[in-house]
């Protein structure tokens, strides 16, 4: 009996979503890239204020136990939390393909305990280490462009997003053991070499993502 009741609730929920899809005011987003590229799961919510304006926010979380790849190329206990409030402006509110320009603030906090790996110090010397505690703080502002790709009668769709902005990043290592100078990497992506660089820096920030969307 409980099984049939759960099935009834499940189908009633999606029937309601389908019925409201033509007059949706809310969108739930799930990032397709974040678990594999950013080592965290990202879920967002958008709310329609009027024909032109939407507001929303994204929350992201990851640990070494739940993400499919190692966080920050380190082995050990890792945790990432990120929040990104955002304001959207619809460029073509009457179009089936919704075009948005948005301003997004973001804050990221990453903590690593008893991790092992490799990194650049502030003098561009490359080291390996057997154990350390790690902290990364990143915050900044992006300007984004995104497109809502969907059918008006459907509750599901896609939203590619691209943007750029500025960010401040602070990385520190403490309680380090087994530190040794190592050979700098010569293969892989160039920006990946310096992703764990110790110290603080202010640089451009780029944002590329693909969202699965659920309208209701």
Task: Indicate residue ranges for each PLM-predicted region.
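Bacterial Sec-dependent N-terminal signal peptides
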Residues: 1-24, 212-216
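Transmembrane beta-strands of outer-membrane beta-barrel pores
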Residues: 32-36, 59-65, 89, 105-111, ...
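Outer-membrane beta-barrel "beta-signal"
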Residues: 88, 202-216
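Repeated loop/turn-to-beta-strand initiation elements of outer-membrane beta-barrel proteins
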Residues: 52-55, 95-96, 151-156
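Membrane-embedded beta-strand positions of outer-membrane beta-barrel proteins
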Residues: 28-32, 57-59, 85-87, 99-105, ...
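Extracellular/periplasm-exposed beta-strand and loop segments of Gram-negative cell-envelope proteins
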Residues: 31, 59-82, 110-138, 168-182, ...
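Transmembrane beta-barrel strand/turn architecture of Gram-negative outer membrane proteins
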Residues: 79-89, 139-148
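Short glycine/proline- and aromatic-enriched beta-strand/turn motifs that initiate or cap beta-hairpins
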Residues: 19-71, 211-215
């Amino acid at each position: 009996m409980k099984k049939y009741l759960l099935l009834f609730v499940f189908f009633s929920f999606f029937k309601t979503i389908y019925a409201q899809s033509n007059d949706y005011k809310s969108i739930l987003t799930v990032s397709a890239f974040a678990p594999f590229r950013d080592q965290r799961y990202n879920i967002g919510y958008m709310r329609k204020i009027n024909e032109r304006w939407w507001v929303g926010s994204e929350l992201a979380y990851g640990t070494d136990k739940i993400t499919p790849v190692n966080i920050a190329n380190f082995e050990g206990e890792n945790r990432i939390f990120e929040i990104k409030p955002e304001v959207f402006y619809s460029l073509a509110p009457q179009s089936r393909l919704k075009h948005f320009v948005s301003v997004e603030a973001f804050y990221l906090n990453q903590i690593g305990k008893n991790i092992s790996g490799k990194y650049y110090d502030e003098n561009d010397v490359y080291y390996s280490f057997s154990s350390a505690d790690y902290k990364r703080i990143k915050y900044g502002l992006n300007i984004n462009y995104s497109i809502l790709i969907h059918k008006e009668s459907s509750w599901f769709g896609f939203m590619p997003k691209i943007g750029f902005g500025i960010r401040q990043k602070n990385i520190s290592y403490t309680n380090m053991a087994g530190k040794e100078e190592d050979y700098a990497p010569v293969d892989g992506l160039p920006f990946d070499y310096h992703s764990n660089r110790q110290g603080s820096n202010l640089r451009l920030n780029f944002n590329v993502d693909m969202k699965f969307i659920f309208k209701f």
